[in-house]
């Protein structure tokens, strides 16, 4: 079957279901696809519960994650939806960024109210920077008493407020199972949930709208022309004759001008996020730049050496360490295109970290790296990946 061409006519938003085990995340996902397929058959196809629940294994930086991707459209938007069935899968996905979310649907069973994993998922969503959460209060067909539902709503709002999410976020009453079975009343509630997503999850900021940033992967000298650096543009756009800074790894940053942009052996006037290209740099010698530095719009980014990060440590089965590590552990931190050694400080009260754990740690790097909150990294020992994480706070 040929891959369908991705039509870029509507805004594209990445979304996901989060919440406690057995509260109905996967059933909610299946119900959304069914109800939208019934409402807009030309735009959507229904995905059965089983096809979502048997999530295929994905490898992201050597970590195995079971995760399902479905897509659907409302009149306003195109959504890519991720559902991580297992609790461990959810944590791994959030930290490694196998699927990034622009917004999340927190599924809470009205029969139970918020449970420990509900709280943990919301905390993790905040840590990894999911911008918006709204709520699907599921299994409402099983609760007769309005007062119970009101109490659950209050608890959910408190939980959102604790993590600085919108306390006034929509809480839509649903019965995912009834909607899946074709019940008209509950089908309407799923449409209301999608309307709430359309109206409340903000449009994501596209990478092209951010200031220019390209990590250097390779460096060449072209006789008579100068030094060319190659890499994939991560953010923003760049035009020929723009000034740029080369930052990170070395103590001092360097300023230069881009005199040529090349892609697939063709000369271009500009490059934008997603492009693999070569940049010809004025007056720069080959030894002035190295892999792992980044080319940026002047003043837009700064290199740092100290940060806090949220980390998932690979289990032995995933090819990680066989033994725990302790305070002052010194692995390499792989940012974008290069490894930098760092010293780990564990949080107060944490003696050691076991393979398979997730942990918040402070890191001091021996060389500066251009970073901001949300930047992902791998932790390596030699060529072996032993962990994955993301920057949650910059210290220095």
Swiss-Prot record:
PANTHER family per UniProt: ELONGATION FACTOR TU, MITOCHONDRIAL (PTHR43721:SF22), ELONGATION FACTOR TU-RELATED (PTHR43721)
UniProt keyword list: Cytoplasm, Elongation factor, GTP-binding, Hydrolase, Magnesium, Metal-binding, Nucleotide-binding, Protein biosynthesis
Question: Which EC number applies?
Answer: 3.6.5.3
Domain tr-type G: where?
10-205
G5: annotated span = 175-177
Quaternary structure and partners: Monomer.
* HAMAP family for the chain: EF_Tu_B (MF_00118_B)
Q: Where is this region: G3?
A: 83-86
Q: What class of enzyme is it?
A: hydrolase
Q: Where in the cell is it found?
A: Cytoplasm
The record's annotation in Pfam families points to:
GTP_EFTU, GTP_EFTU_D2, GTP_EFTU_D3
Q: What is this protein called?
A: Elongation factor Tu
Annotated stretches, region: G4: 138-141
The chemistry this enzyme catalyses reads: GTP + H2O = GDP + phosphate + H(+)
What would be one Gene Ontology cellular-component term for the protein?
cytosol
Q: Please name the gene that encodes this protein.
A: tuf
Q: Domain of life here?
A: Bacteria
Q: Name one GO molecular function term.
A: GTPase activity
InterPro entries named among the record's database cross-references = EF-Tu_GTP-bd (IPR041709), EF-Tu_GTPase (IPR050055), EFTu-like_2 (IPR004161), EFTU_2 (IPR033720), G_TR_CS (IPR031157), P-loop_NTPase (IPR027417), Small_GTP-bd (IPR005225), T_Tr_GTP-bd_dom (IPR000795)
Region spans: G2: 62-66
- The primary site where this protein sits is cytoplasm
Which residues does the annotated region (G1) include? 19-26
Where on this chain does Mg(2+) bind? 26
Q: Does the keyword Ion transport apply?
A: no
Return the similarity comment.
Belongs to the TRAFAC class translation factor GTPase superfamily. Classic translation factor GTPase family. EF-Tu/EF-1A subfamily.
The entry's GTP-binding residues are 19-26, 83-87, 138-141
């Amino acid at each position: 079957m040929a891959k369908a061409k991705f039509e870029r006519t509507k805004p594209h938003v990445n979304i996901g279901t989060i919440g406690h085990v057995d509260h109905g995340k996967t059933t909610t996902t299946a119900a959304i696809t069914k109800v939208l397929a019934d409402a807009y058959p030309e735009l959507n196809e229904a995905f059965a519960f089983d096809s979502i629940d048997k999530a295929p294994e994905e490898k992201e930086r050597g970590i195995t994650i079971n995760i399902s991707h479905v897509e659907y459209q409302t009149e306003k938007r195109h959504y890519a939806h991720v559902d991580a069935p297992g609790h461990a899968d959810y944590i791994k996905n959030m930290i490694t960024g196998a699927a990034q979310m622009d917004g999340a649907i927190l599924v809470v069973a009205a029969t139970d109210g918020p449970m420990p994993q509900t709280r943990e998922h919301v905390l993790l969503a905040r840590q990894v920077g999911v911008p918006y959460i709204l709520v699907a209060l599921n299994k409402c067909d099983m609760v007769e008493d309005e007062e119970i539902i009101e109490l659950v709503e209050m608890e959910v709002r408190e939980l959102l407020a604790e993590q600085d999410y919108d306390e006034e976020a929509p809480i839509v009453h649903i019965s995912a199972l009834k909607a899946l079975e074709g019940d008209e009343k509950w089908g309407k509630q799923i449409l209301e949930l999608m309307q709430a997503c359309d109206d409340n999850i903000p449009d994501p900021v596209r990478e092209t709208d951010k200031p220019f940033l390209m990590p250097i992967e390779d460096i060449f000298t072209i006789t008579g022309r100068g030094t060319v650096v190659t890499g994939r543009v991560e953010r923003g756009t760049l035009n020929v004759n723009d000034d740029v800074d080369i930052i990170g790894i070395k103590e001092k940053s360097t300023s230069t001008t881009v005199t040529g942009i090349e892609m697939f052996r063709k000369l271009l006037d500009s490059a934008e996020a997603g492009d693999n290209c070569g940049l010809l740099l004025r007056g720069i010698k080959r030894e002035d730049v190295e892999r792992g530095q980044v080319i940026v719009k002047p003043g837009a980014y700064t290199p740092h050496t100290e940060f806090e990060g949220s980390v998932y440590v690979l289990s032995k089965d995933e090819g990680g360490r066989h033994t725990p590590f302790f305070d002052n552990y010194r692995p390499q931190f792989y940012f974008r295109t290069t490894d930098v050694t760092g010293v780990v400080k564990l949080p107060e009260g944490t003696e050691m970290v076991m393979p398979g754990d997730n942990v918040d740690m402070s890191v001091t790097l021996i060389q500066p790296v251009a970073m901001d909150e949300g930047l992902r990294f791998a932790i390596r020992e030699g060529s072996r990946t032993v962990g994955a994480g993301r920057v949650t706070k910059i210290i220095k």
